Design a protein with these regions (language model features):
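An N-cap/entry alpha-helix motif that binds or orients negatively charged groups
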Residues: 1-57
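Alpha/beta enzyme core
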Residues: 30, 37-326
Length: 326
């Protein structure tokens, strides 16, 4: 038998790490932080084991815990003390994210990314200003152009509070361009935008909506988030956000959309982000709780696959645990 090519030669323990094509680092990771203006104590998120909402007063302590694990970047989500039809608390000077970011920026060295959307702030749970009659007519949805002004106001308020990067997530047409213009006008031309460029209307978001109290009161988000079936549409969405000035391009969710991540990496020189979402996190925990999987191993392999597909940064609820093992 003449086997000149034997790939197993490079699988021994000594050489395996030398020829590994992909590796994870703590600098690849972004940890989500949920700040809740409705509570004075930490509240565990039942559907996301190990995750919790923290009051504004605990936000710095929470970020310090993440930093001690080795993760330097966070993304902040807010749960406001009150909601209304237009989501006005989202851009309030004394809003939950604004107050938390001021504290975190002043007292830690964390790199602070802020999520820019309206779903946590509207009493209807949708990601923008509603068209007239949308709460009773399923043919109606979010008013795209009216929502753009709100997103620009939110972004500017986060910038004023000290955010290091703005991350619009609503899948509203034109959101990146409008936010870029608003930031530039206010003197924040050097503040980068990480766009949720290809965000699908996914069943994997369930636990997050519990965590952030942002589930729609009626209907769904099919009219503005992408159809999971569409890859060509993802390319179009990504191209539009790149043209409008996005500095980082994100795919959400991550694991079911690695084909989109890989194509984005091939086609663009922008940094690529992927969001390892709550459902991806929760299902691994559920399987591990049944004894079917080893959680540390499958978490590492899942994030490694996202990195291998082409992601430069990964937003993940596994950030702290993985960082400690790395």
């Amino acid at each position: 038998m003449d086997l000149r090519d034997r790939p197993r030669r490079l699988r021994t323990d000594g050489v395996r790490p030398l020829v590994a094509e992909t590796s994870l680092s703590t600098t690849d990771l972004v940890a989500p932080v949920f700040v809740d203006a409705t509570t004075d104590e930490r509240v565990a998120i039942e559907s996301m084991p190990g995750q919790e909402r923290v009051p504004i007063e605990e936000s710095v302590a929470r970020v310090e815990e993440i930093a001690e694990a080795g993760v330097e970047a966070i993304i902040v989500f807010g749960i406001p003390e009150s909601k209304d039809r237009s989501g006005t608390r989202a851009w309030a000077n004394d809003g939950v994210v604004q107050r938390a970011v001021r504290r975190i920026s002043a007292e830690t060295d964390a790199y602070v990314i802020t999520d820019v959307c309206l779903c946590e702030y509207t009493d209807h749970g949708h990601c923008g200003v509603l068209e007239e009659g949308a709460d009773s007519d399923p043919r109606l949805t979010v008013d795209n152009d009216a929502t753009l002004d709100s997103l620009a106001r939110i972004a500017a308020s986060h910038a004023e509070a000290g955010a290091d990067m703005i991350a619009p997530s609503g899948m509203i047409d034109g959101m990146v361009g409008r936010i870029r213009s608003a930031l530039d006008r206010e003197g924040y031309e050097n503040l980068p935008i990480m766009s949720y460029a290809a965000k699908s209307e996914s069943a994997f978001y369930g636990p997050f909506r519990d965590a952030a109290d942002g589930a729609p009161a009626f209907g769904d988000r099919r009219h503005y988030q992408m159809d999971p079936a569409n890859a060509r549409e993802a390319r179009r969405e990504i191209a539009l956000d790149a043209e409008e000035g996005a500095d980082v391009l994100m795919v959400k969710p991550a694991l079911p959309y690695l084909d989109i991540v890989a194509e984005l990496r091939r086609e663009y020189d922008h940094p690529v982000a992927a969001y390892n979402v709550s459902g991806e996190y929760a299902m691994l925990h559920a399987a591990a709780d049944r004894g079917w999987l080893s959680l540390p191993e499958v978490a590492h392999e899942s994030l490694l696959s996202i990195k291998r597909a082409g992601a430069d940064l990964i937003i993940t609820y596994f950030a702290e645990d993985l960082a400690r093992r790395l």
